[in-house]
Amino acid sequence: LLTQLASQDMDGKSFEVKGTAGSAANLRLLSDHYIELGIAQADLIHDAYYGTGDFKNDRLSGYKAVASLYAEACQLVVRADSSIQTLDDLQGKTVCIGEEDSGTERNAKQILEMSGLTDQIIDTVNLDYTNMAKQLESCKIDAFFITAGIQTTVIEELTRRCDIRLISLDQKCINKIQSAYEFYTEYTIPANTYTGQTEDVHTISVRSVLLADTSLSDKTVERLTKALFD
């Protein structure tokens, strides 16, 4: 719907949907004017604007915020038969932290860092959503992180192939992360969000924001916001 509305104001040019590695990639593509619309996490938008964090000495510009969309929960998934019950149990395990240059990777690294879980303690790998689910199912990895709106499709689809559990972050970890990084909000994934999930899961979240190239007309941006909120 959004792409259809936007294309009406672009002199007959249609938008093409592109798959990317995630937030950081979208910000760079917007800044280089390769894409005209993209979604990114608020924490990465902040760093890209100020040239901090993952964008140290690499300030990006050329895009504007259109709307805050929804909370993206940092979700840690294991097989139901796994011995992993807490973050500390990841020691000595193989953990997928998402694709390179993605918001998931950044969030996972910060959670692990705040929990004292360095690369010397756990083995981290980079995989896309589809392959992380496949490798957890086949026991090639022990856990994966994914930052996304809840009722995440890839997680729910995985429940149809094997039993899984979501791991809660302990309150000490949540407090420490919130103190260090202002964009994180404490978040609860309600019981029964996923098949077989019988208890609430406690974690953190970041906001997802719709961005547009600065060259996109105000009229088009107005149509986009109306489509979202009217």
Across the structure, where does each feature detected by a protein language model lie?
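Bilobed "Venus flytrap"/periplasmic-binding protein-like clamshell domains
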Residues: 1-17, 68-138
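Pocket-flanking alpha-helical
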Residues: 3-4, 16-57, 132-135, 151-158
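Extracytoplasmic
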Residues: 10-12, 22-25, 32, 60-63, ...
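Soluble non-cytosolic domains of exported or imported proteins
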Residues: 20-24, 39, 99-106, 127-130, ...
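Pocket-lining segment of extracytoplasmic ligand-binding domains
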Residues: 42, 52-53, 82, 118-211, ...
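A structural signal for short loop-to-beta-strand junctions that line the ligand-binding cleft
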Residues: 56-69, 74, 193-202
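Short amphipathic alpha-helical coupling segments at ligand-binding clamshell hinges
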Residues: 217-227
